[in-house]
Amino acid sequence: MKFVDSADLIIKAGKGGDGAVSFLHALFVPNGGPNGGDGGDGGSVYFQGDEGKHSLLDLKLQKKYSAQDGFKGDIKNMHGANGEDKIIKVPVGTILYDKKTNTILADINENNKLVLIAKGGKGGKGNARFANSRNKAPTIFEAGELGQEFEIRAELKVLADVGFVGLPNAGKSTLLRAISNSKPVVADYPFTTINPQLGVARTKNNDTFIVADLPGLIQGASLGKGLGHQFLKHIERCLVICHIIDASGNFGSEDIIKNYELIRNELKAYNLNLEKRAEIIVLNKMDLDEAQLNLLDEKIINYFKNKKVVQISGLKKENIDQLLFMIYEELKIAKKQPLWELDKNNDQDEIAIYKFEEQKEDIQVYNKGNNRWEIAGETIFKIYQKFPIWTEDNLLMFNEKLKETGVYETLVKKGIKKGDFVKVFDYELEWTD
């Protein structure tokens, strides 16, 4: 399957069903009362973690997802059926962003985790709901509310306990094969690994953890060079970083230290908190004579003396048990501190509960000239959408709700006169006061 780790989507929840206007018609009941039922609620859009999925390819191919609209109410106080919800299954490790604000809406980090992203509109009330002592035969009804609609970005960040990072050809893929049942492509040229590879490692004590071989980094990766951002984002989910270094570098200690600092600087530039992650420096290819000679250099000894270092040969599987033991010990410590605590100062990676703040928008009044006015705003739109002026009672209710907002008072203060016209979205109404 093609590995796709990001997709842009439009999701739309269902509209609520309209309330019904009807009256009882029965033998011997000549003046039956109102019995219009309420509309059903629109379906909502959910995302659900699915450990059987490993790519966002499905989302890339289908970019629009909609839940079903609610059904309208009916006679005899019959309630309209609710619209069917839409559940979109994504790989565990998917993060959903609001494209407009770039804030995190949800972190789907567990199998079967169900997250509500777009809520369906509430069904409108039927005329039976509006009967009272003053109006025993109302023709008032509510239209169903619109469902929420959003543009979102889905990103898949590999969920692994440990991430292998390093320059191309550091031997990460060979090491992954040595410690797990994974079979990544291995060859003697840069960028053999172009997608994250996962494997399950097992210690001598049968303790297991998940390892990700992350594609080789180059200088400037934090700025997006090479396949920079595409790879670096996967490291954010790893609790322990294993920095794999080719110890057989042609330029000895200078090569080893330079390569280490290059990768460290890229991690730091991309996300300051990556610098705080538990790190193990893995000096690889120790089966080669050049590597043995390089590590005799005092520069290397002094530079790494206060760091956690292990010497191994991924190809010959030498010292692998010690590496696995060190990783597992670091993991036990790291797992006591949640990942978002490590990143609590990083706004980019803040864990946010999906929540859309309702926009508070002032009512707007425009004098268009030639005896024409226009009113707009979120509050006005909600009234316009909720009370279609298809019946006389709804027109009266529409006017009453607008009056309650204070917009009529504003129009008077601005100089509206009898006979002027007021545009309210698709409606154009004559001012009669």
UniProtKB/Swiss-Prot annotation:
Gene Ontology molecular function: GTP binding; GTPase activity; magnesium ion binding
Domain called Obg: residue spans: 1-159
Domain annotation OCT: ranges: 355-433
Entry-linked PROSITE patterns: G_OBG, GTP1_OBG, OBG, OCT
Pfam (any one): MMR_HSR1
Entry-linked InterPro entries: G_OBG, GTP-bd, GTP-bd_Obg/CgtA, GTP-bd_prot_GTP1/OBG_C_sf, GTP1-OBG_CS, GTP1_OBG_dom, GTP1_OBG_dom_sf, OBG_GTPase
Residue ranges constituting the OBG-type G domain according to the UniProt record: 160-332
Enzyme class, UniProt record, top EC level: hydrolase
Example of a GO cellular component annotation carried by this entry: cytoplasm
Binding site for Mg(2+): 173, 193
Keywords: Cytoplasm, GTP-binding, Hydrolase, Magnesium, Metal-binding, Nucleotide-binding
GO biological process assignments: ribosome biogenesis
Primary location: cytoplasm
UniProt keyword DNA damage present: no
Cofactor list: Mg(2+)
Subcellular localization(s) per the UniProt record: Cytoplasm
Claim: Secreted is one of the keywords in the record: no
Family that this chain belongs to: Belongs to the TRAFAC class OBG-HflX-like GTPase superfamily. OBG GTPase family.
Name this polypeptide is given: GTPase Obg
Provenance organism: Mycoplasma capricolum subsp. capricolum (strain California kid / ATCC 27343 / NCTC 10154)
Organismal lineage: Bacteria, Bacillati, Mycoplasmatota, Mollicutes, Mycoplasmataceae
